[in-house]
From Swiss-Prot:
Disulfide bonds: none annotated. GO terms for biological process: potassium ion transmembrane transport. Residues 372-396 are annotated as: Disordered. ATP binds at D355, E359, F416, S417, A418, E419, T420, R421, M422, S423, K435. InterPro entries: ATPase_P-typ_cyto_dom_N, ATPase_P-typ_P_site, ATPase_P-typ_TM_dom_sf, ATPase_P-typ_transduc_dom_A_sf, HAD-like_sf, HAD_sf, P-type_ATPase_bsu_IA, P_typ_ATPase. The keyword Zinc does not apply. This is Potassium-transporting ATPase ATP-binding subunit. Signal peptide: none annotated. The chain crosses the membrane at residues 35-55, 62-82, 228-248, 254-274, 624-644, 652-672, 698-718. The gene is kdpB. Its EC number is 7.2.2.6.
Length: 719
């Protein structure tokens, strides 16, 4: 499935601005104590602008008006960050809604009629909105499935590309784990009877849309904890600044010419000291993290799941579909007995030229790579249209052999059968070539080299699959097949290990195959001959050690483990039980996607931590700017702290508030995009965080505040 696209147009930009003002409602802002206090400060500034002498102030109306406007902009910019992020979330929900298709359904009048005997007299064509839950509909070739349901009779090839993005159709049939169908998908062949399982407005897509919208609104546990921390800091600063007011009154009683501290300037100091930057961006960071997950076509049921992905200690991976493609491809040819390389390559090529299986196509591809391209009767390379699996095959060596494809079209291709466990070709000259499982070919052949078993066992021990090849009853060699590793999977596993996540492979394959795959990609730990039911025990064992664990699954038997795991990524192509149990659903049904999800979770936590560090460092810098400016008149010794040598106290206050307000919109793109994240250890990330965002947070205010003060001097403002 193509990535869910999100586009914010001009109208939505205007909507975000409008929402920024709507969020000024105190009943809404009280949920964010930091911004609520800033809004109260704005109100105090407005009162002092209207009545400057109310608190015994000595500043001008213009000065107080400037302070009030800057405080107001601080709140508005913070609201805009949240509103813009929320619009991105809404745009994602709209993208999912665009996948919904209005369709008509053939509502059966009699559910008992045999599917092969259904005619137009047996059903009524009605709108999908009129079909009730538990009703049975008939879906013929070329029809759109009107509603989500379960196949109760028949089997059909279904195009689910609108939902999954997979162009390859899937088989849906009654019985087993492949009975679930989704409304809006198309039946390409055959016919099925479907029992509707959802009410109107409760389809799979409706649920996904609801999950996206709900997840955007819900605060995550870490965000709640951060809000509590910021609230505590805000309370401390409110008490400290309020105490300073009375301290100023005390100083005024014996310091000549000092009339006390200006309330508006104290409000400015309070706002500058509070963690307004991270308080303003917290919601935007959360929503943006959810947005990045959804853009990967993963639906997270809550922000908790995304955060948990960033905190994972262990990741359980399936072999097939996650680490390997699930396809076996030819890796080498091994001659036996009196045969040589050329004999084995030629026989393997001829027996596989019309074999449409992945293994057959990869054998042709490997033979051609070892000997150069071969021209068929039609003048086209026999492997020209091979699929991706064959493309990854590398020739182990060069073999001089004539691969004559001419005349093979007149030969008789023998397809694979479960009974013989072999396939092959009968050439027009009477030659019989067979390839297949070693024991099957061994039983078929009349001449078997003594090293057949030894060589086949060696291939099996290396994680491969041996196919024996025989010509006229004589075994001439072995074709070595290997599970095809997903491109770049070793690098991705190494990357996730750098994040401090332990990788564990659980597979039903034998020990030899499991060990070979684990060694190839660098898995930390593997479990072979593993039943899906055992996964929940593995999850519980890891959690008993105090670790967070993630896994993927698609079957009903995966559901308990998916529900138990801290991060359970269910495949959209899987069963309803799996999708309900997991806290994430991958619309692309790509198990290796969980590695990306872990990276997104890490980036979310990294972004929040980095901007928190930057915000706190900002506050420290602003403290050294404002405190000497406000108290220098009463305590001249504080002038030594004025390291920027700002022109006037009014200029210092105004420049600081300008920086405090405008740094928020400047950081919105970073909050939405996320900080650049590379897989590193926790110690390396902490060091980088402190240097880049801690150091940057200390230096940036000094640079910008001094620049603004110099601009004021040049313009003659506050002089």
């Amino acid at each position: 499935m193509a990535e869910i696209t999100v586009t914010i147009d001009t109208d939505q930009q205007k909507q975000a601005i409008s929402d920024s003002f709507a969020k000024l409602d105190p009943q809404y802002l009280v949920k964010n104590p930091v911004l609520f206090v800033v809004e109260l400060g704005t109100i105090i500034g407005l009162v002092m602008t209207i009545a400057p002498g109310l608190f015994g102030a000595t500043g001008s109306r213009v000065y107080y008006a400037v302070i009030t406007v800057l405080l107001g902009f601080t709140v508005i910019f913070a609201n805009y960050a949240e509103a813009y992020a929320e619009l991105e979330g809404e745009a994602q929900a709209d993208s999912l809604r665009a996948l919904q298709t209005e369709a008509e359904g053939k509502l059966l009048q009699n559910d008992d009629v045999d599917i092969e005997d259904i005619s137009e007299d047996d059903y009524e064509v009605v709108a999908s909105t009129e079909i009730e839950q538990d009703a049975v509909v008939f879906v013929d070739e070329g029809d759109i499935i009107p509603r989500d349901g379960t196949v109760v009779e028949g089997s059909a090839s279904v195009d689910e590309s609108a939902i999954t993005g997979e162009s390859e159709p899937v088989i849906r049939q009654s019985g087993g784990d492949r009975t679930s169908v989704v409304g809006g998908t198309e039946v390409l062949s055959d016919r099925i009877k479907v029992e509707v399982t959802s009410e109107e407005g409760e389809s799979f897509l409706d649920q996904m849309i609801g999950l996206v919208e709900d997840a955007q609104r819900q605060k995550t546990p870490n965000e709640i904890a951060m809000t509590i921390l910021l609230s505590g800091l805000t309370l401390v600063f409110v008490v400290a600044v309020a105490t300073m007011f009375f301290f100023g009154e005390y100083l005024a009683s014996f310091v000549g010419g000092f009339a006390g501290l200006d309330v508006a300037e104290l409000v400015a100091l309070l706002v500058a000291l509070m963690p307004t930057t991270i308080g303003a961006l917290l919601a935007a960071i959360r929503v943006a993290g959810m947005t990045r997950v959804t853009r990967r076509n993963v639906i997270a049921k809550s922000g908790r799941a995304v955060e948990a992905a960033g905190d994972l200690d262990a990741l359980i991976l399936d072999k097939t579909g996650t680490i390997t493609t699930g396809e076996r491809v030819a890796q080498d040819f091994h001659p036996l007995g009196d045969a040589d390389d050329a004999d084995v390559v030629r026989a393997s090529y001829q027996s596989s030229l019309y074999d449409e299986t992945t293994e057959g196509r990869s054998i042709v591809k490997l033979a051609e790579k070892m000997n150069g391209k071969v021209q068929t009767d039609g003048g086209q390379s026999a492997s020209e249209e091979l699929d991706e699996p064959g493309d990854s095959v590398d020739a182990p060596r060069d073999v001089s052999v004539t691969l004559d494809a001419e005349g093979l079209s007149e030969s008789n291709f023998v397809p694979f059968s479960a009974e013989t466990r072999m396939s092959g070709i009968d050439l027009s000259d009477g030659t019989e070539i067979r390839k297949g499982a070693v024991d099957a070919v061994e039983e078929y052949a009349t001449t078997v080299p003594g090293k057949l078993r030894q060589k086949s066992n060696a291939i099996s021990e290396s994680g491969g699959t041996p196919l024996a090849i025989a010509v006229d009853g004589q075994v001439v060699g072995i074709i070595e097949l290997q599970d095809e590793l997903k491109p770049g999977i070793a690098d991705r596993i190494a990357e996730i290990q750098k994040m401090g996540v332990e990788t564990i492979m659980a597979t039903g394959d034998n020990q030899r195959t499991a060990r070979w795959v684990a060694d190839q990609v660098g898995i930390d730990e593997f479990h072979a001959e593993f039943d899906p039911e055992e996964k929940i025990e593995l999850v519980e064992d890891i959690q008993d050690d105090g670790k967070l664990v993630g896994m993927t699954g698609d079957g009903t038997n995966d559901a308990p483990a998916l529900a138990k795991a801290d991060v359970g990524l269910a495949m959209n192509a899987g069963t309803n039980a799996a999708k309900e149990a997991g806290n994430m659903v991958d619309l692309d049904s790509n198990p290796s996607k969980i590695i990306e999800v872990v990276g997104i979770g890490k980036q979310l936590l990294m972004t929040r931590g980095s901007l928190t560090t930057f915000s706190v460092a900002n506050d420290v810098a602003k403290y050294f700017v404002l405190l000497p400016a406000i108290l220098a008149a009463a305590i001249p010794g504080l002038g030594a702290m004025d390291i920027l040598n700002l022109s006037t106290p009014a200029s210092a206050v105004t420049a600081t508030l300008m920086y405090n307000a405008f740094i928020i919109p400047l950081l919105i793109p970073l909050a939405l995009r996320g900080v650049d994240y590379k897989a590193q250890s926790g110690a390396q990330l902490l060091r980088k965080n402190l240097i880049v965002y801690g150091g940057g947070g200390l230096i940036a205010p000094f640079i910008f505040i001094k620049a603004i003060d110099m601009l004021f001097v040049a313009l003659g403002v506050f002089q």
